[in-house]
Amino acid sequence: MKLKQGSRLLFTGDSVTDVGRNRPVAQGTLFDPLGKGYPHIVSGLINAVYPGWGIHVINSGNSGDTSRRLAARWQTDVLDFKPDWVSVMIGINDVWRQFDSPCQPEEQVGPEEYEETLGGL
């Protein structure tokens, strides 16, 4: 990944990305609303390696999201921020819904839908 001054990095996904970020969408500032997960760690590393570059890190992860829910919010929570780079970590809830919601098939995301949804993003 080649960063440039002023680059915008956006991290999105499920709870693995969210990890307590501020709402509505967390953007790295003085009070670090990025949460305590990997977006926070990456932001710290980037700012240590590229101080003064004005690299803008955004976290739009949502705990509990499936790939279907991520696709539904893709425009507002990803594209509208006009990121230069996007990191997506999604999928555990697609698997988990098979087990925690066995009587709610409308909440379940199978492998074919998962692959198609990610391909469409």
In which residue ranges do the predicted regions lie?
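Alpha-helical cap/lid subdomain in secreted, periplasmic
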Residues: 2-5, 36-56, 65-121
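Short, flexible micro-motifs
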Residues: 16-18, 23, 64-67, 94
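Short glycine-rich His-centered loop
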Residues: 2-32
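Residue-level recognition of beta-strand->loop/alpha-helix junctions
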Residues: 59-61
